[in-house]
Amino acid sequence: MESIGIVAPHKMHFTEPLQLQNGSSLAGYDLMVETYGTLNAARSNAVLVCHALNASHHVAGVYADNPKDIGWWDNMVGPGKPLDTDKFFVIGVNNLGSCFGSTGPMSIDPATGNPYGAAFPVVTVEDWVNAQARVADQFGITRFAAVMGGSLGGMQALAWSMMYPERVGHCIVVASTPKLSAQNIAFNEVARSAILSDPDFHGGNYYAHNVKPKRGLRVARMIGHITYLSDDDMAEKFGRSLRRAEGAVDAYNFNFDVEFEVESYLRYQGDKFADYFDANTYLLITRALDYFDPAKAFDGDLTAAVAHTTAKYLIASFSTDWRFAPARSRELVKALLDHKRTVTYAEIDAPHGHDAFLLDDARYHNLMRAYYERIANEVNA
């Protein structure tokens, strides 16, 4: 199926201070935005797609100057795709604190004339949602037909339905969770520790030293990447295969160089990530993941936390996702059904672990296509 083709991002500047959950505020900030499709006259066909940890506003299509830079959810969004841009106006927003053009640690702090670095304020999922709401205001969108996201993006979609219930028709939460488990927080802490202990980190102000803490960022990515894959998927892809040149003896080298194919793969992923991502951003986003817990204000009662929601929900999980296991999605489903919300739940049998939400799986995409067709019918009614 064809891509949406060449797209171009644009930068929105906001001068009104954004109050943050930590008590501080951003006096002025930029958000990178990308749109696909056409907003109808009633402004009723808009869908917001929220991104996960290392993604951005570039949801679909390609850039004219870099045709290899394909949008991170290009198989989901586009003409004739499950989220059909012939029917919907789709918005992607790069979150505050990211490193892809929105205001973040790499941006210049107007108070000092230097990059924010470690001084950039800690942000939360709720802060992102409030910033995204201002983007919607700029487009004159008072209500989204749907807000959708996978993983961390799913947390944002859920937060939208709780913080702005009157502005969300459908909330689509994929491979996500209403809060991180202790195990997930632990993985994030180990990843952050790898970055913080890198000699090139310099307390987060490594820009002034013209270096990057690549060693720490590389290890952080390797840790994270393991959690995105299932055991079965890793066994099928790599097994215990040794990394050897064609025709070489299939025997151990008895040293600490790369021996196994899975080691080579993880190092490749770590190296690639360290080349394009920012370490301070990684710290910020993983901490935002840790802090997300809308039930906390209700003494841990998720049912109470979702009491004032009004959206219809599609919640999808994957059988082999152990990062955000199906049990976490079922917990959310139960809380919503306790209030008799309209909920569609699908637990998809897929071997690819957490990353399954990014892949072109027929059952998964058929589910999304059918659900968006239902939304399109509502929009056109």
Curated annotation (Swiss-Prot):
The record marks R323 as: Important for acyl-CoA specificity. Keywords: Acyltransferase, Amino-acid biosynthesis, Cytoplasm, Methionine biosynthesis, Transferase. Substrate binds at R221, D355. It comes from the Bacteria. Disulfide bonds: none annotated. InterPro entries: AB_hydrolase_1, AB_hydrolase_fold, HAT_MetX-like. It catalyses: L-homoserine + succinyl-CoA = O-succinyl-L-homoserine + CoA. The keyword Cytoplasm applies. GO terms for biological process: homoserine metabolic process; methionine biosynthetic process. PANTHER family: HOMOSERINE O-ACETYLTRANSFERASE. This is Homoserine O-succinyltransferase. The gene is metXS.
